[in-house]
Amino acid sequence: MSIDRTSPLKPVSTVQTRETSDTPVQKTRQEKTSAATSASVTLSDAQAKLMQPGVSDINMERVEALKTAIRNGELKMDTGKIADSLIREAQSYLQSK
């Protein structure tokens, strides 16, 4: 099937410039800023502990050991165990629906 062009393409003759006024944008930003400064946030103890620098629930030594084992081709995985867990999770999910 062939599609023939019925009329030639014409370029846009002129592009009209859009006049922008910064005052509405600035006014909106000022309103948002004033609303944001009046908010108060209180963190729970658990959240506060997570926000502290240097606190991590990730064992970086274990992560590095796993990376090294993967890189060296030494990581052994029990695919049967993984498959069984996936099936168990899927069954649990479907039963909860």
UniProtKB/Swiss-Prot annotation:
The gene is flgM. It is found in: Cytoplasm. Responsible for the coupling of flagellin expression to flagellar assembly by preventing expression of the flagellin genes when a component of the middle class of proteins is defective. It negatively regulates flagellar genes by inhibiting the activity of FliA by directly binding to FliA. One of its GO terms (biological process) is negative regulation of DNA-templated transcription. This is Negative regulator of flagellin synthesis. One of its GO terms (molecular function) is molecular function inhibitor activity. Residues 1-40 are annotated as: Disordered. Residues 13-27 have a biased composition (Polar residues). The lineage of its organism: Bacteria, Pseudomonadati, Pseudomonadota, Gammaproteobacteria, Enterobacterales.
